[in-house]
């Protein structure tokens, strides 16, 4: 093996080791405590509460060559097992159901994003964002 090839092999090895080392410092995909806001059309206040959501790093890869005949799938940290809890929103007028149900993450998984249950956008609102007046109510 010539000197340029040896240098490339060493350089490639260093890059691989750095990539592995960096990924070991990223938080894994797991349930974490988060403050979220729940609100409902017709009710004047939103409720801010504590729950668990899925958050963390999932290994992904992007192909160098993108064929028009293949699809690229990126895995995201999303819910595996959930429990649903229901709370009552304050000051809802008569005729508006004051109850709202929200998910509590029990376990998480790196898998394809399901838009029915997850926000998979690049930039979304913060989980505790309210359109209406806030009322803090901490639930664990």
Curated annotation (Swiss-Prot):
GO terms for cellular component: cytoplasm; extracellular space. Disulfide bonds join 29-77, 43-92, 46-130, 54-108, 58-110, 113-120. Its main location: secreted. One of its GO terms (biological process) is G protein-coupled receptor signaling pathway. GO terms for molecular function: hormone activity. Involved in gametogenesis and steroidogenesis. Belongs to the glycoprotein hormones subunit beta family. This is Gonadotropin subunit beta-2. It comes from Carassius auratus (Goldfish). The lineage of its organism: Eukaryota, Metazoa, Chordata, Craniata, Vertebrata.
């Amino acid at each position: 093996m010539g000197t340029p090839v040896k240098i490339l092999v060493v350089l490639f090895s260093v890059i691989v080791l750095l990539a592995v080392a960096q990924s070991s410092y990223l938080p894994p995909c797991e349930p974490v405590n988060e403050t979220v806001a729940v609100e409902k059309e017709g009710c004047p206040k939103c409720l801010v509460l504590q729950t668990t959501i899925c958050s963390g790093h999932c290994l992904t890869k992007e192909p160098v060559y993108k064929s028009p005949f293949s699809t690229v799938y990126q895995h995201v940290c999303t819910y595996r097992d959930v429990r649903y809890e229901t709370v009552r929103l304050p000051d809802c007028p008569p005729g508006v159901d004051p109850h709202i149900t929200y998910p509590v993450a029990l376990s998480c998984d790196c898998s394809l994003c399901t838009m029915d249950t997850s926000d998979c956008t690049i930039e979304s609102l913060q989980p505790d964002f309210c359109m209406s007046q806030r009322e803090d109510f901490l639930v664990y």
